[in-house]
């Protein structure tokens, strides 16, 4: 039996924190589905297609090294619906701090009420990944700062290109 987990998020952009969670998750499951949330009304920096390509490029080798299959999908509805579609029995959620825990506990409770067959598993961020957020990465990159300590090299290059095009 294949153990499948869903890791949902915006991944705009993918960060070293996301890779940390992916690495940990791939040690626990046979198949990890990374689900990119696409929500009308939001204006992401990268399109869903660009985010999928960056996730494939950066997370693919991590999953392969850990012996897990990786799939990238998009969703525009509830994460529980995405989990059911891909046959996931586990929601993967990363935790950086107590603020994340409070929010994620509420989310886990709501998801558990809607999809009791899908268990939420919290993975603590490594010390190096704890301060990283995609929001801060976008802000730093947008102001011309060096984000290379916080994101994979391919993402840093795409951020430089994106913000160079806007200046």
From Swiss-Prot:
Binding site for substrate: 10, 42, 79, 93
Keywords, sorted A to Z: ATP-binding, Coenzyme A biosynthesis, Cytoplasm, Magnesium, Nucleotide-binding, Nucleotidyltransferase, Transferase
Top-level taxon: Bacteria
S-S pairs: none
SUPFAM superfamilies tied to this protein: Nucleotidylyl transferase (SSF52374)
GO MF annotations in UniProt: ATP binding; pantetheine-phosphate adenylyltransferase activity
Pfam family of the protein (one): CTP_transf_like
UniProt keyword annotation of ATP-binding present: yes
Binding site for ATP: 10-11, 18, 94-96, 104, 129-135
Cofactor entry: Mg(2+)
BP GO terms, sorted: coenzyme A biosynthetic process
Reaction it catalyzes: (R)-4'-phosphopantetheine + ATP + H(+) = 3'-dephospho-CoA + diphosphate
Main localization of the protein described in the UniProt heading: cytoplasm
Protein role: Reversibly transfers an adenylyl group from ATP to 4'-phosphopantetheine, yielding dephospho-CoA (dPCoA) and pyrophosphate.
Name of the protein in its database record: Phosphopantetheine adenylyltransferase
Native source species: Methylobacterium radiotolerans (strain ATCC 27329 / DSM 1819 / JCM 2831 / NBRC 15690 / NCIMB 10815 / 0-1)
Gene (name only): coaD
């Amino acid at each position: 039996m294949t153990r499948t987990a869903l890791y949902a998020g915006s991944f705009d952009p993918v960060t070293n924190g996301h890779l940390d969670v992916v690495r940990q998750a791939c040690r626990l499951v046979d198949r990890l589905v990374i689900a990119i949330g696409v929500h009308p009304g939001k204006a992401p920096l990268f399109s869903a297609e660009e985010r999928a390509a960056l996730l494939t490029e950066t997370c693919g080798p991590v999953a392969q090294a850990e012996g897990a299959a990786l799939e990238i999908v998009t969703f525009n509805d509830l994460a529980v619906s995405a989990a059911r579609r891909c046959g996931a029995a586990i929601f993967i959620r990363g935790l950086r701090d107590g603020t994340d825990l409070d929010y994620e506990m509420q989310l886990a409770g709501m998801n558990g009420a809607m999809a009791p067959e899908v268990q939420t598993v919290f993975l603590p961020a490594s010390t190096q990944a704890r301060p990283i957020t995609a929001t801060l990465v976008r802000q730093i990159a947008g102001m011309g700062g060096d984000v290379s300590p916080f994101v994979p090299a391919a993402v840093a290059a795409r951020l430089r290109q994106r913000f160079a095009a806007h200046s």
